[in-house]
């Protein structure tokens, strides 16, 4: 969903501020979201971080705190605007790019309704409210539903 993509962008801002700027654990935390065209309620949001071995536990703790804060509604209007602006700029650039249109059209030949969704991209993102993001964060960022994968060097204890 577009709201999940915008929530991902807000989370990305918070990850950068906390993990890079405040803690210095990593230069670039990254995250992504996935939804399904087939299963309307299916989707997830994930975070990836490359950190030094001694910072793994503290990094998990920081990510948990950020997710809990988002789920508790700690999203400002300024964060929504700062997260939305680059998405709208990417959409504007894509609409001016033949490659983007070729990709969209190739995905729409069997589902022409996708073209309406493409045309509504910018307005959909512009209409997502802070309250919608807070509701989505409360749904998606529940600690009991989270999974962790840690990849360590072979010689790590």
Regions found by a protein language model. Give the residues of each.
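M16 family metallopeptidases and their MPP-like homologs
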Residues: 20-127, 144-153
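Carboxylate-rich, divalent-cation-coordinating active-site regions
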Residues: 17
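Low-complexity, intrinsically disordered Gly/Pro/Thr-rich segments
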Residues: 130-138
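Amphipathic alpha-helical interaction/coupling elements
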Residues: 6, 83-86, 136
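Short, conserved catalytic/metal-binding micro-motifs enriched in Asp/Glu and His
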Residues: 5, 133, 148
């Amino acid at each position: 969903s577009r709201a999940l993509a915008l929530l991902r962008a807000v989370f990305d801002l918070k990850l950068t501020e906390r993990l890079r700027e405040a803690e210095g654990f990593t230069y670039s935390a990254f995250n992504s979201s996935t939804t399904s065209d087939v299963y309307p309620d299916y989707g997830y949001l994930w975070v990836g971080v490359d950190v030094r071995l001694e910072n793994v536990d503290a990094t998990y703790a920081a990510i948990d705190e950020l997710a809990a804060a988002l789920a508790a509604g700690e999203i400002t209007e300024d964060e929504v605007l700062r997260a939305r602006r680059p998405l709208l700029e990417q959409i504007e650039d894509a609409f001016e790019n033949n490659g983007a249109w070729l990709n969209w059209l190739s995905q729409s030949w069997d589902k022409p309704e996708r073209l309406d969704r493409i045309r509504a991209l910018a307005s959909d993102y512009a209409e997502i409210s802070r309250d919608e993001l807070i509701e989505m964060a409360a749904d998606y960022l529940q600690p009991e539903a989270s999974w962790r994968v840690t990849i360590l060097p072979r010689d790590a204890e």
